[in-house]
Amino acid sequence: RLTLNVISSDFPGEQADSAYRYRRSWEVVEILKQAWTQDEINYDGEIYKLKGLSTDPVRPYQINGGPLLYFGGYSPDALALCGAHCDTYLMWPEPKDMLAQRMRDVHAQAEKHGRLLDYGLRVHMIVRDTEQEAREYADELVSKLDDAAGAAIRNRALDAKSLGVSLQSANRDRADEDGYVEPNLWTGVGRARSGCGAALVGSVDQVMSKIDDYMKMGIRSFIFSGYPHLQECEIFGTKVLPQLKTVSLPHAYGRVPSTTPATPLGVGKRK
C-alpha cells in the first residue's frame, strides 16, 4: 500500500545549496534501505553518522527491498541519485519530446548501475464530453486570477526557486495565446500554483489518446488531480478511469509481503 516520493527541498527556515540537499537525500535513501533490509543501521556519511542503530520496528513485511521509491528532479545530482537508488522517475508535464529526453538522461544514469527505471507523470486533468467544454472550463478556472496574486502564491512555495519550477514557467512562456504548449496540454493552471503547472484539457477521447501516447513512451505511473478536487475526481473517475489499463508497480516489482501482515488492515474484518 505504501510508496514513497523523495523530495530534495529545503526544510522550513533553511536555505541549503542544491548539492547539499541532494547529498542529504542520497544518504537518507541509503539509510532507509538499511532500515528496511538489515537488523542494524551502520552508516558513515558526510552528513549522517549512525552506528549500531536497531531497525526494529521499522523493517517492513517486504523481504526484498522495502517500499518503491519515487523521485523527481532535473539537475545532474538529481539524475545521479535517481539512477542509483530509486525506482520511478517522476516528471512534471512538458512537451512529449522534452519528456522523452528527460527519460533518456536518467536512463543513462541508471545504466551505470545496471538498473532499469520506471517512469511517472504528475499532471492535472480537465476532461469533459467535448474539447470546447473542457477549454471553456479551463478558461473559467483562471478567469478571475490576478497575475500578481498568482505570482505571490507561487513565490510562497518552498520550491519556488527550483530548476523544475523554472522549467514549468518556461512552458508558459512557450505556450500559445490560449496557454497551450502542445495540443491538449494547458499551462494556465501554473499561473496560480508552484510545482506541477500544466493540465491535460480535452474530450474523453483526446485525454485517453494523450495518456496512451505517454504509455507508449514507457510511462506507466501517473498522478492525476484537478480543481476543485472532489468534482474533478468524480468526473475523471466516471469518464476516464474505467477505460485505463492499470498496473500495480509493487506487484510488478515483487515488492509485496510474502505473507499477510498481522495488522488490523491485514487481517481485520472488512465491513
Give short role names for the model-derived ranges.
Residues 18-62, 94-216, 245-271:
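An alpha-helical appendage that flanks or caps ligand/catalytic pockets
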